[in-house]
UniProtKB/Swiss-Prot annotation:
ATP binds at I10, G11, E12, G13, T14, Y15, G16, V17, V18, K33. Phosphorylation at Thr-14 or Tyr-15 inactivates the enzyme, while phosphorylation at Thr-161 activates it. Residues 4-287 form the Protein kinase domain. GO terms for biological process: cell division; G1/S transition of mitotic cell cycle; regulation of G2/M transition of mitotic cell cycle; regulation of meiotic cell cycle; signal transduction. Gene3D superfamilies: Phosphorylase Kinase, domain 1, Transferase(Phosphotransferase) domain 1. It comes from Vigna unguiculata. One of its GO terms (molecular function) is RNA polymerase II CTD heptapeptide repeat kinase activity. Belongs to the protein kinase superfamily. CMGC Ser/Thr protein kinase family. CDC2/CDKX subfamily. One of its GO terms (cellular component) is cytoplasm. The modification Phosphothreonine is found at T14, T161. The modification Phosphotyrosine is found at Y15. The gene is CDC2. This is Cell division control protein 2 homolog. It catalyses: L-seryl-[protein] + ATP = O-phospho-L-seryl-[protein] + ADP + H(+); L-threonyl-[protein] + ATP = O-phospho-L-threonyl-[protein] + ADP + H(+); [DNA-directed RNA polymerase] + ATP = phospho-[DNA-directed RNA polymerase] + ADP + H(+).
Length: 294
């Protein structure tokens, strides 16, 4: 650890404290994530090993880079590139952001590129939210951070833990108790982020699982076997749910053009099997005017 000098604590991560720090060798500013090991008799928690193994494989311009792993008997530190701005802070502090549809488009494109890359490596993110989308102020490039809850998924998709995605960005199949979800859960979250960037407020700000579901159904309509085959068999589906008709998405996201609305509605399909994939979404006509040099 002699190589790294802590500068200040910048937050509490899923598994421990995050510090801003300096690399004494290169003089580079880095983010140091300290993983708590005290409760673990076996040493390094499997959650951290999973995060490390995933992140070491993840080499992409839109993924936060894991630079080093420092391990001692009682401590585990992950060394990441340092970015001090996240999408939540950026939206809160930049009133001009909402007036710049190109900026929204550029950010959305980069989120989708990062997610498409993850999915191509059989990795779900599962915890997408504005706080873990980091922005490089100099280049305006956006990177996905915090793979704390991600895990590699094989085919067939295994049963996953229930608590993964922050409520406002949580896909309806998870809210309805599905144990066999896959990559569409991330695409749903990206759709929620897209609408939030355009509207400057969350689309489905539920304060409980049922409130979240009902906020979704009030806008997109209550699903049934016709619109989502198999939905009534999900563990938490109730035949007593109010039967709301779908609203026109254009009234909910009025500042979005036709191509944007088409993309958004294909990301917010209630039936996960009908949801667009990240790989196909990056080719959508909404992005046709983007000249993005990799």
């Amino acid at each position: 650890m002699e190589q790294y000098e802590k500068v200040e604590k910048i937050g509490e991560g899923t598994y421990g404290v995050v510090y801003k720090a300096r690399d004494r060798v290169t003089d580079e500013t880095i983010a140091l994530k300290k993983i708590r090991l005290e409760q673990e008799d076996e040493g390094v928690p499997s959650t951290a090993i999973r995060e490390i193994s995933l992140l070491k494989e993840m080499q992409h311009r839109n993924i936060v880079r894991l630079q080093d792993v420092v391990h001692s008997e009682k401590r585990l530190y992950l060394v990441f590139e340092y970015l001090d701005l996240d999408l939540k802070k950026h939206m809160d502090s930049s009133p001009e952001f909402v007036k710049d549809p190109r900026q929204v488009k550029m950010f959305l494109y980069q989120i989708l590129c990062g997610i498409a890359y993850c999915h191509s490596h059989r990795v779900l993110h599962r915890d997408l939210k504005p706080q873990n989308l980091l922005i490089d102020r100099r280049t305006n490039s956006l990177k996905l951070a915090d793979f704390g809850l991600a895990r590699a998924f094989g085919i067939p998709v295994r049963t996953f833990t229930h608590e993964v995605v922050t409520l406002w960005y949580r896909a309806p199949e998870i809210l309805l108790g599905s144990r066999h979800y896959s990559t569409p859960v991330d695409v749903w979250s990206v759709g929620c982020l897209f609408a939030e960037m355009v509207n400057r407020r969350p689309l489905f700000p539920g304060d409980s699982e049922i409130d979240e579901l009902f906020k979704i159904f009030r806008i997109l309509g209550t699903p049934n076997e016709e619109t989502w085959p198999g939905v009534t068999a999900l563990p938490d589906f109730k035949s007593t749910f109010p039967k709301w008709p779908p609203k026109d998405l254009a009234t909910m996201v009025p500042n979005l053009d036709a191509a944007g609305l088409n993309l958004l509605s294909s990301m917010l399909s209630l039936d996960p099997s009908k949801r667009i994939t990240a790989r196909i979404a990056v080719e959508h006509e909404y992005f046709k005017d983007i000249k993005f040099v990799p």
